[in-house]
Amino acid sequence: MAIEQVLETLAKLVSFRSVTPYSSGSLEYIAKLLTNAGFSCDIQVFGEKEEEKTTNLYARYGNGSPNICFAGHIDVVPPLNENLWDYNPFELKVIGEKVYGRGTVDMKGAIACGIVSALNYLKIYPSPSGSISFLLTSDEEGCAKFGTKPMLEYLAKKGEKIDFSILGEPTARAHFGDTIAIGRRGSVNFVLKIIGKQGHVAYPHTAINPITSAVKIATDLMNIDFDNGSEFFEKTNLEVISFDVGNNVVNIIPEQATLKFNVRFNDFHSAKSIFGIVLEVISKHEVIFDLQYESSAESFVQKYSEKMKKFTAIVQNQSQIPPKIDTNGGTSDARFIHKYSEIVEFGLSFDQAHKINEHTQISDLQSLYNVYYNSLVEFLQK
């Protein structure tokens, strides 16, 4: 049965300690599997420093169009506190309906379903009217500078064209199949340093306390009403994530205070426009400050195409519920892929991602396999 193949493949993938940005042999293993099934495999390593070196795999079966691509990342976040796990995080454990292991949800489970669905499809239809491909990286959970982005640039220079991508990020909220992502919010990180004047707490008139201004500015920032959301996006949101003064001395007013905050923004904005709004709010306060920002992603949303409608129908047929077309969640490699290919993000439930005792359900793996397999039938059978 297919689920047994999925579990066998997933067990092997989980056994690789592929903590970002290291493949630890996992992509090489996948390449061998796919090569044996007739895929042409291309492995590229990007990054100059040892700690940057990232393994990327592009595998393709066939030369025709459309090219249906299973995209994803084999890297996982560290398990941390392994002593708090009930089982070895890098050894798949099946207990009843639950399947435990680091990456089962995010996102080795989806990769296993994609691999098995492709191999089983090709056993029945060895000459599809199109191509099947895989685009996999070991650098998504980290900086993502040496993974999917440069691999896509490399493939474009070679003339490779991907027509439709399925990115197996965990998307389900309450039930399998309840959400399909066709876009993502943008993200921009800020570091604000407010400069005061150090002094003795007993003589505050000789000092300028930066904390006083920092608290007022933080309040104003959190009260910014950026927008009311848009058709596919929720309201833009700002969260203060750190407030530091670096002062452990009880009788000193510190020299400076540092605020760090993140803004997740919709398609009304860009990172630059968000910076302008933030700067305007801070500038209303009479303080000396330094403001730096860095964006990891701009927002994007794609046109809801015919292929996306067909994919939605496949999901609904499997789950028996109409999926929500969504753009929420964290950043993903879809921010790179959508520039080269139509893309949907669809995978398992995100509520277990990055958690201790990360796990998924056997029934969800079976359902995901069915969706992926039926997608190949839909898009590649004339």
Question: Where in the sequence are the language-model features?
Answer:
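Catalytic metal-binding/acid-base residues of hydrolase active sites
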Residues: 19, 75, 141, 171, ...
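Short beta-strand segments
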Residues: 71-73, 135-137, 165-169, 193-195, ...
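Residue-level recognition of beta-strand->loop/alpha-helix junctions
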Residues: 45, 136, 293-295
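Metal-dependent amide/peptide-bond hydrolase catalytic core
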Residues: 1, 171-175, 182, 188-382
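Glycine/serine-rich anion-binding loops at beta->alpha junctions
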Residues: 97-113, 200
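Acidic/histidine-rich catalytic neighborhood of metal-dependent amide-processing enzymes
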Residues: 107-183
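A structural signal for isolated positions on well-ordered beta-strands in alpha/beta enzyme cores
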Residues: 42, 69, 133-135, 290
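Acidic/His- and Gly-rich active-site-bordering loop/insert found
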Residues: 2-99, 123-128
